[in-house]
Regions:
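N-terminal export/targeting leaders of redox proteins
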Residues: 1-29, 106-107
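Electrostatic cytochrome c docking/interface patches
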Residues: 19-39, 81-84
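Soluble non-cytosolic domains of exported or imported proteins
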Residues: 29, 66, 70, 86-90
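Gly/Gly-Pro-rich "capping" loops immediately C-terminal to redox-active cysteine motifs
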Residues: 32-37, 45-81
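Cys/His-enriched microdomains
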Residues: 42
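C-terminal capping alpha-helices of c-type cytochrome domains
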Residues: 85-107
Length: 107
């Protein structure tokens, strides 16, 4: 019986890990390292900290504000346009994928 229990626990753990790393289809193949680099390079946290105070993380919290992967990508594109960051579409996607992985967790 212990053998079956171990198999079941292993299966549940593997499903949990796969879901933890799952990304929506629009973020599949996004370069997460590039996204992290761009977030640091463009000082996204500093701007968001000025806008919402504290450490800036409250920008991710308003319920229902960003409720789909497409809307998240659109918000990153809006920052890109308004701040004239010059990011290419794949850059915007990479930044949105990192934000999704770290904060929103859309599947």
């Amino acid at each position: 019986m212990d053998y079956i229990r171990w198999i079941a626990m292993g299966w549940m753990l593997s499903c949990t890990l796969v879901n933890a790393w799952a990304q929506p289809a629009m973020f599949k193949g996004a370069d997460l390292k590039l996204g992290e680099q761009l977030i640091a390079e463009h000082k996204c946290s500093a701007c968001h900290t000025r806008r919402v105070g504290g450490d800036g993380s409250d920008i991710y919290n308003p319920q229902g504000r960003i409720n789909t992967p497409g809307f998240l990508r659109g918000m990153v594109e809006q920052c890109n346009t308004e701040l004239n960051l010059g990011m290419f579409p794949e850059d915007v996607n990479a930044v949105a994928a990192v934000l999704n992985r770290n904060h929103y967790k859309f599947k």
